[in-house]
Amino acid sequence: MQYKIVRNDISIVKADAIVLPANTMLREGSGTSTALYEKAGRAELEKACKEAKKRYKKQLYIGEAIPTLAFNLDADYIIHAIVPKWKGGHNHEYELLSSAYYSSLKLADMMSCK
Protein backbone atom coordinates (compact mmCIF):
# COMPACT_ATOMS: atom_id res chain seq x y z
CA MET A 1 0.00 0.00 0.00
CA GLN A 2 1.29 3.43 -0.89
CA TYR A 3 1.17 6.34 1.56
CA LYS A 4 2.15 9.96 1.22
CA ILE A 5 3.92 11.82 4.00
CA VAL A 6 3.12 15.54 4.02
CA ARG A 7 5.16 18.17 5.84
CA ASN A 8 2.87 21.13 5.38
CA ASP A 9 -0.51 22.33 6.59
CA ILE A 10 -2.25 18.97 6.86
CA SER A 11 -5.56 20.66 7.64
CA ILE A 12 -5.95 21.38 3.91
CA VAL A 13 -4.81 18.01 2.57
CA LYS A 14 -7.25 15.88 0.57
CA ALA A 15 -6.84 12.31 1.83
CA ASP A 16 -8.66 9.22 3.01
CA ALA A 17 -7.11 9.75 6.44
CA ILE A 18 -4.91 12.25 8.25
CA VAL A 19 -2.74 11.09 11.15
CA LEU A 20 -2.78 13.45 14.11
CA PRO A 21 -0.41 13.14 17.09
CA ALA A 22 -2.66 12.81 20.15
CA ASN A 23 -2.54 12.38 23.91
CA THR A 24 -4.06 9.52 25.90
CA MET A 25 -7.14 11.62 26.70
CA LEU A 26 -7.82 12.41 23.00
CA ARG A 27 -7.95 16.08 23.91
CA GLU A 28 -6.89 18.96 21.71
CA GLY A 29 -3.21 19.77 22.04
CA SER A 30 -1.37 22.65 20.42
CA GLY A 31 0.03 23.44 16.98
CA THR A 32 -1.13 20.87 14.44
CA SER A 33 -3.85 19.67 16.77
CA THR A 34 -5.34 23.15 17.12
CA ALA A 35 -5.33 23.67 13.34
CA LEU A 36 -7.11 20.37 12.70
CA TYR A 37 -9.68 20.89 15.45
CA GLU A 38 -10.39 24.37 14.10
CA LYS A 39 -10.87 23.26 10.49
CA ALA A 40 -12.68 20.00 11.31
CA GLY A 41 -15.12 21.69 13.66
CA ARG A 42 -14.04 21.75 17.30
CA ALA A 43 -17.39 20.75 18.85
CA GLU A 44 -17.95 17.82 16.48
CA LEU A 45 -14.40 16.52 16.80
CA GLU A 46 -14.38 16.81 20.60
CA LYS A 47 -17.65 14.86 20.74
CA ALA A 48 -16.28 12.22 18.35
CA CYS A 49 -13.14 11.85 20.47
CA LYS A 50 -15.19 11.32 23.64
CA GLU A 51 -17.34 8.72 21.88
CA ALA A 52 -14.30 6.96 20.40
CA LYS A 53 -12.63 6.79 23.79
CA LYS A 54 -15.73 5.18 25.30
CA ARG A 55 -16.25 2.84 22.34
CA TYR A 56 -12.73 1.45 22.24
CA LYS A 57 -11.95 1.34 25.96
CA LYS A 58 -11.68 3.61 28.93
CA GLN A 59 -7.86 3.87 28.97
CA LEU A 60 -5.85 4.61 25.84
CA TYR A 61 -2.16 3.81 25.76
CA ILE A 62 0.81 5.42 24.07
CA GLY A 63 1.53 3.57 20.85
CA GLU A 64 -2.12 2.99 19.93
CA ALA A 65 -4.18 4.66 17.20
CA ILE A 66 -7.90 5.51 17.23
CA PRO A 67 -10.01 6.74 14.26
CA THR A 68 -12.71 9.41 14.16
CA LEU A 69 -14.52 11.07 11.31
CA ALA A 70 -12.77 14.15 9.90
CA PHE A 71 -15.93 16.29 9.65
CA ASN A 72 -15.15 19.54 7.76
CA LEU A 73 -11.67 18.49 6.63
CA ASP A 74 -11.10 17.28 3.08
CA ALA A 75 -10.45 13.78 4.46
CA ASP A 76 -12.68 10.94 5.56
CA TYR A 77 -10.95 10.15 8.84
CA ILE A 78 -8.55 11.46 11.43
CA ILE A 79 -6.37 8.74 12.88
CA HIS A 80 -5.30 9.85 16.35
CA ALA A 81 -1.82 8.42 17.03
CA ILE A 82 -1.29 8.27 20.79
CA VAL A 83 2.26 9.61 21.12
CA PRO A 84 4.60 10.01 24.11
CA LYS A 85 5.65 13.27 25.70
CA TRP A 86 9.30 13.97 24.98
CA LYS A 87 11.41 13.45 28.10
CA GLY A 88 14.88 13.73 26.63
CA GLY A 89 14.80 10.47 24.67
CA HIS A 90 15.73 8.30 27.63
CA ASN A 91 12.25 6.90 28.36
CA HIS A 92 11.67 4.84 25.22
CA GLU A 93 10.12 7.80 23.36
CA TYR A 94 11.56 6.67 20.02
CA GLU A 95 10.09 3.18 20.31
CA LEU A 96 6.73 4.48 21.55
CA LEU A 97 6.53 7.06 18.77
CA SER A 98 7.39 4.41 16.21
CA SER A 99 4.69 2.15 17.66
CA ALA A 100 2.08 4.94 17.44
CA TYR A 101 2.78 5.56 13.78
CA TYR A 102 2.98 1.85 12.97
CA SER A 103 -0.43 1.43 14.65
CA SER A 104 -1.73 4.34 12.56
CA LEU A 105 -0.55 2.81 9.29
CA LYS A 106 -1.94 -0.59 10.28
CA LEU A 107 -5.30 1.01 11.11
CA ALA A 108 -5.30 2.95 7.82
CA ASP A 109 -4.70 -0.31 5.98
CA MET A 110 -7.53 -2.05 7.88
CA MET A 111 -9.83 0.86 6.98
CA SER A 112 -8.82 0.56 3.28
CA CYS A 113 -7.33 4.05 3.23
CA LYS A 114 -5.14 4.89 0.27
Residue spans of the language-model regions?
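Macrodomain-like recognition of ADP-ribose-binding/processing modules
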Residues: 1-114
